[in-house]
């Protein structure tokens, strides 16, 4: 029994190490150039051991992306549950975390993700859930006086998403960093939907 428990703990630990190492490689180098051999070598494990846990790169990529997104969601849920944090605190934290997370990400990673059907399906479902949650969040912001009441937030969310897609499709990242692109699109939309009260808090947060 103790032996089985030890083996289970080892496999869980190894799985976590693989996910962490793989995601680091994917984020910095893109997906295509990272081979399963590279990940096995980085962890000093055999390729056979790696394939016993993940049968192919897409399976590994999917779980790595899922864990990455769940960690972000968990952070935002915990942050949002703090009663001292206003709507503006929450949305600023959301975009600050996004900007920090993407600062060192290779544009190739974002482009090449779209070539993996299972990952695309997962992200589409995740984005649909986030879209619905964002609509509820913006309505709360209207009630609290931070966001304008004359805005169609469904349109705002869809056009901001389309702007991000356009930046990737036209390879704008070759001219500007991903962080710069986000800062000049997302914060433009965000400032535009704010009331005077919201703008004051937004400007104060950006100045920090």
Label for each model-derived stretch:
Residues 110-118, 204-207:
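Short linear capping/connector segments at secondary-structure termini
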Residues 1-3, 136-140, 144, 173-208:
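C-terminal peripheral helix-coil segments that are non-catalytic and often amphipathic
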Residues 1-29, 33-45, 59-62:
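Basic, helix-initiating cap at the start of DNA-binding domains
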Residues 63, 77-104, 157-160:
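Hydrophobic alpha-helical connector segments
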Residues 44-54:
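Short hydrophobic/aromatic patch on the recognition helix
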Residues 119-146, 153-164, 169:
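Amphipathic alpha-helical packing segments from all-alpha helical-bundle domains
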Residues 66-73:
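Short, basic, alpha-helical segments at the C-terminal edge of helix-turn-helix-like DNA-binding modules
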């Amino acid at each position: 029994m103790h032996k089985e428990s030890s083996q289970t703990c080892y496999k869980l630990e190894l799985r976590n190490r693989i996910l962490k190492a793989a995601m680091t490689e994917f984020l910095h180098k893109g997906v295509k150039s990272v081979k399963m051999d590279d990940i096995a070598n980085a962890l000093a494990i055999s390729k056979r051991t790696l394939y016993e846990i993940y049968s192919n790169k897409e399976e590994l990529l999917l779980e790595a992306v899922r864990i990455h997104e769940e960690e972000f969601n968990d952070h935002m849920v915990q942050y949002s549950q703090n009663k001292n944090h206003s709507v503006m605190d929450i949305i600023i934290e959301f975009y600050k975390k996004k900007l920090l997370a993407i600062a060192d990400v290779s544009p190739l990673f974002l482009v090449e993700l779209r070539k993996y059907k299972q990952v695309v399906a997962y992200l589409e479902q995740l984005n649909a859930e986030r879209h619905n949650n964002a609509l509820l969040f913006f309505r709360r912001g209207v009630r609290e006086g931070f966001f304008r009441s004359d805005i169609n937030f469904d349109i705002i969310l869809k056009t901001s998403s389309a702007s991000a897609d356009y930046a990737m499709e036209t390879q704008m990242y070759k001219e500007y960093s991903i962080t710069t692109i986000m800062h000049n699109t997302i914060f433009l939309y965000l400032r535009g939907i704010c009331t005077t009260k919201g703008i004051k808090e937004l400007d104060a947060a950006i100045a920090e």
